[in-house]
Amino acid sequence: DMDLIVSMEGFNGNVRTYIEDTFEPNEIFHNGNAYSFDYKELQIDFITVSPEDYGSNYHYLAFNDLGNFIGRIAQSMGLKYGQEGLWYNHFHNDQKVGKIMISKDYPKIFDFLGLNYARWIEGFDSLEDIFEYIIQSPNFDSEMYEMKNLNKINRERNLKRKSYMSFLDYIAENAPNITGPDHNKPKILKEASIFFECNVFTEIKRFEYHDAERAYASAKFNGGMVMDKYGLKGQALGVAMKNFKGLVISHMGITESYHQY
């Protein structure tokens, strides 16, 4: 198959129609920002992205499963690495309340994760070259890739990926007992904020403020109160809540934040 990263800059048409007119496929499967179709017995995956995410998608998707392997290193450090770059998911009161972008500067990202960006630029001739590249990171840990240490979604996804399973075999044969550093994740986050010159902790406070604001608003007015007082349930309850919110915003001049009301 072939993956094509397509920048949507300057394109205002319908992607499905463009594919139908240009490639005349038998079938098109659409999932999120990806369109999969057949062309001359080859499966094509059109991955449509905004111009600002073109480079980050290229870096993540290049060289087979390498981006996935790098993502596990970032995860061990309390960060996320994917098709949008490097970021941090902040949890407050056991719930995710915000996503904080850290960087799209790949030489710096690779440096921070303990990877050689110049070597990445050279490219890789084989899966074994990719495997060895990951193992050489000082943040590599043999256990972090084991199925038992993945969540259900990643476990099910990676079981279907031949390159991931080959990597597990390679680790078992060549690097079975490498233990990576025991990262102090709050310390790593502080180091990242300095290294990338980003306002991580300001954003954390902003997300926590808005989370507290939502909790306060919910304590004042929520679906349970409406259900108890008026006996509404299901769809009727949802409509009533939506209409009340619309009334507050449109007729009472509360435009900045419904939760402030």
Question: Predicted segment positions?
Answer:
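Polar/charged alpha-helical tracts
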Residues: 17, 21, 169, 173, ...
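Alpha-helix capping and helix-coil boundary motifs
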Residues: 7-15, 105, 126, 233-236, ...
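Extended, charge-rich intrinsically disordered regulatory tails
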Residues: 217-261
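Charged/polar, solvent-exposed surface patches and flexible loops
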Residues: 17, 21, 72, 76, ...
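Metal-dependent nucleotidyltransferase catalytic core
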Residues: 6-49
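Catalytic cores of NTP-dependent nucleotidyl/adenyl transfer enzymes across multiple folds
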Residues: 38-231
